[in-house]
């Protein structure tokens, strides 16, 4: 959110001024949305909310509270807007839209617009600040009932309906946000562990170790990819190098357990071999996953015991490698 706030403020200032000459207030102070099309990812298990904002430009010192009325404008959900998504400047948005043939409005019954102003649909740009925040709270059960929402096929179309005394920047008065989800364990993980290798008779013939090292070579780092609200795939097994294809599926249970299963097209038929679980730390960087599974390689059976340690994840174009929520450090 910190990164997005900086972008919002910079964009608003540039929209009403030329930055190299910006040494004082301009005659016109105006507000608007920085991005007319955007995609936001809701993280399953971390609270199904996100924030967007109305930014103020044209003044260094905002000397008053400004109430900006924001509403939903369904007329913005059209083919022209869809084309802006598919041809987006940000590659991660354009890539997400490749498999989305059209957009539709997210049903209003699934989400609420909240604000620290206490007034529904009102963003308040407080005195001394340049950003008014709108928080979108999504009903998790209703949203996740459609697993296809992994893609941003549905949008929330926002528009400033009244600046209440503050000018609105032409062309910046609206923002259409595609909404999708990611599982909380998606991303890149340092990998380590050991494997007991048994012969056809079930006798252990050797133990292979592959310790976790930080930093770790990229071809040893595992990638977990969201395939459903509570499902991910992993792109490696045991001590082998990773690849582009999924090698096993992880299904998360309500008790933080993980069920391991095979996936079509994988190198091995991976099966569970003992309990697997994830450690739900409040801090992103402290999360770990413990996996126990087996697979047959030639005439041998590999019994793998792995630990994954969180490295980073890319959410909405932002590299997240440690928790940014101050409350999680309390």
Positions of the model-derived regions?
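Intrinsically disordered, low-complexity regulatory regions in eukaryotic proteins
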Residues: 18-123, 133, 137-330
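Beta-strand-enriched, solvent-exposed domains that form extended recognition/catalytic surfaces
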Residues: 129-130
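Sec-dependent bacterial lipoprotein signal peptides
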Residues: 1-18
